[in-house]
């Protein structure tokens, strides 16, 4: 990891290993039992997955000092955006030469 000192790399690896252990501690439930029992096990598994995800995010936030999500993309002002709705433009943005037709069964 370029630009980091060795001690912080080791701390990051420890954090990632802890997160990996958290996810490995909650395997997907077995497909046994009645439909209701399977549904309940999956519901509890999803709830534990949400908890693990929240804990993992807190671990990374504590280590990195910022959320794990990427920075939002900067978009240009709305005044500069426009849609081209002319009838003769192609549907996929590709232009075809004048006089040619596309479609199945046309000759």
Swiss-Prot record:
Spell out the Basic residues composition-biased ranges.
36-48
Q: Does the keyword Transcription apply?
A: no
Which controlled-vocabulary keywords does the entry list? Answer: AIDS, Host cytoplasm, Host nucleus, Host-virus interaction, Methylation, mRNA transport, Phosphoprotein, RNA-binding, Transport
Q: Where is this motif: Nuclear export signal and binding to XPO1?
A: 73-84
Gene Ontology, cellular component aspect: host cell cytoplasm; host cell nucleolus
Miscellaneous: HIV-1 lineages are divided in three main groups, M (for Major), O (for Outlier), and N (for New, or Non-M, Non-O). The vast majority of strains found worldwide belong to the group M. Group O seems to be endemic to and largely confined to Cameroon and neighboring countries in West Central Africa, where these viruses represent a small minority of HIV-1 strains. The group N is represented by a limited number of isolates from Cameroonian persons. The group M is further subdivided in 9 clades or subtypes (A to D, F to H, J and K).
What is known about what this protein does?
Escorts unspliced or incompletely spliced viral pre-mRNAs (late transcripts) out of the nucleus of infected cells. These pre-mRNAs carry a recognition sequence called Rev responsive element (RRE) located in the env gene, that is not present in fully spliced viral mRNAs (early transcripts). This function is essential since most viral proteins are translated from unspliced or partially spliced pre-mRNAs which cannot exit the nucleus by the pathway used by fully processed cellular mRNAs. Rev itself is translated from a fully spliced mRNA that readily exits the nucleus.
- How does this protein assemble? Homomultimer; when bound to the RRE. Multimeric assembly is essential for activity and may involve XPO1. Binds to human KPNB1, XPO1, TNPO1, RANBP5 and IPO7. Interacts with the viral Integrase. Interacts with human KHDRBS1. Interacts with human NAP1; this interaction decreases Rev multimerization and stimulates its activity. Interacts with human DEAD-box helicases DDX3 and DDX24; these interactions may serve for viral RNA export to the cytoplasm and packaging, respectively.
From the Swiss-Prot or TrEMBL record, give the protein name.
Answer: Protein Rev
Organism phylogeny: Viruses, Riboviria, Pararnavirae, Artverviricota, Revtraviricetes
